[in-house]
From Swiss-Prot:
Keyword Lyase among UniProt keywords: yes
EC numbers on record: 4.1.1.77
InterPro entries referenced in this protein's UniProt entry, alphabetically: 4-oxalocrotonate_decarboxylase, Fumarylacetoacetase-like_C, Fumarylacetoacetase_C_sf, Hydratase-Decarb/MhpD_sf
SUPFAM superfamilies: FAH
Keyword Transferase on entry: no
Pfam families per record: FAA_hydrolase (PF01557)
Entry GO MF terms: 2-oxopent-4-enoate hydratase activity; 4-oxalocrotonate decarboxylase activity
Pathway given in the UniProt record: Xenobiotic degradation; toluene degradation
Protein name per Swiss-Prot or TrEMBL: 4-oxalocrotonate decarboxylase
Species of origin: Pseudomonas putida (Arthrobacter siderocapsulatus)
GO CC term, one of those recorded: cytoplasm
Catalytic reaction list: (3E)-2-oxohex-3-enedioate + H(+) = 2-oxopent-4-enoate + CO2
Length: 264
């Protein structure tokens, strides 16, 4: 993997980006100052942010995929999605409150998450491997919050920023894989009682489990894998919708109940 940043630059950028998250202030995208940065550099920064959180006592409780729409990938000129990690304090209970004072410019996406019962190891991981390894699925709403000004960034910058990860809400009911067709699963997103987005699971790479296979293969590039018992958000079924203090959101999942939260 081609890298252009030295260790000191990685450490400084990881601290800079994480401070923006923890202090809820926006920053210029990092490629403004480091235009030669590569994806390998960006993931090295992301893993350093992860290490900083673990050193501080936070637990890493899951993984997430981003850029999981074929159209969006074509628009960005890339061939694979991106991934990030989920820290323990990102979790919000169903019906709970999201404190916007700790965020910059939050948006929500409807997603399907899975929990694995067996490890998944790339390269060469495919959807059949994922089907055999998934324990159950659960409806999830992701709150994304880019640390970059005006939510404007390039792909390398967003990878370094942990794929804009900040909060997630799980709810509805868990289901076994054989009891639900994730490809045709319908989703309705409501904000303040009005429908704002509609979608189906096929929006995620044709099938949400394809996203999990890609995650295993991306992790393999760093010598990592997906352990058994991993919570994975597979990617946005709907477009991202901006939220602000005073907003109430509910996302309804066909046959799986709903997930809701209040923003203050």
């Amino acid at each position: 993997m081609n890298r252009t940043l030295n260790r000191e630059q990685v450490l400084a950028l990881a601290e800079h980006i994480e401070n923006a998250e923890l202090q809820a202030h926006d920053i210029h995208k990092v490629t403004n100052d480091y235009p030669e940065m590569t994806f390998a550099d960006a993931y090295t920064i992301q893993w350093e942010i992860r290490r900083r959180k673990e050193e501080r006592g936070n637990k890493i409780v899951g993984l997430k995929m981003g850029l999981t729409s074929w159209a969006k990938m074509a628009q960005m000129g890339v061939e694979t999605p991106i991934y990030g990690f989920l820290a323990d304090y990102f979790s919000v209970p169903d019906g709970g409150v999201v404190d916007c004072s700790k965020l910059i410019h939050p948006k929500i996406e409807a997603e399907i998450a899975v929990v694995t019962k067996a490890p998944l190891v790339g390269p060469g991981c495919h959807i059949g491997d994922v089907i055999a390894a998934v324990d159950y699925v659960i409806p999830t709403v992701e709150v994304i919050d880019s640390r970059y000004e005006n939510f404007k960034f390039d792909l390398i910058s967003v990878v370094a920023d942990n794929a804009s990860s900040t909060r997630y809400i799980t709810g509805g009911r868990m289901a076994n894989l054989e009891d639900v067709d994730l490809r045709t699963l319908g989703v309705v997103m409501e904000k303040n009682g009005e429908v704002v987005e509609l979608g189906a699971g096929a929006a995620v790479l044709g099938h949400p489990l394809s996203s999990v296979a890609m995650l295993a293969n991306l992790l393999a590039e760093r010598g990592e894998h997906i352990p058994a018992g991993t919570f994975i958000m597979t990617g946005g079924i709907t477009a991202a919708v901006a939220v602000a203090p005073g907003d109430n959101i509910t996302v309804r999942y066909q046959g799986l109940g709903s997930v809701s939260a209040r923003f203050v």
